[in-house]
Amino acid sequence: MDTQTILNEMSLIFREVLKRENIVLDNETTAQDVEGWDSLTNMQLINKIEKKFNVRFTFRDIVKLKNVGDICHAILTELVKT
């Protein structure tokens, strides 16, 4: 799986959780760039991402995630472990 595939899947998850069809993500996208991406929705997003990609993040992993690119990298890292 590559970064673009992960990014595309994450876009679908973001649209579903935030109930907005016009969300466009790139590696530099942060919570400040997306209306409605707050701490509560962040946990919902992480939960759906973990289920979609069959990965688990520790609290420490989650705290380190600063943008969408970091999430993609974390997913790839977890996928390599399995």
PLM regions and their residue ranges:
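Phosphopantetheine-dependent thiolation modules in NRPS/PKS and related acyl-activating systems
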Residues: 2-82
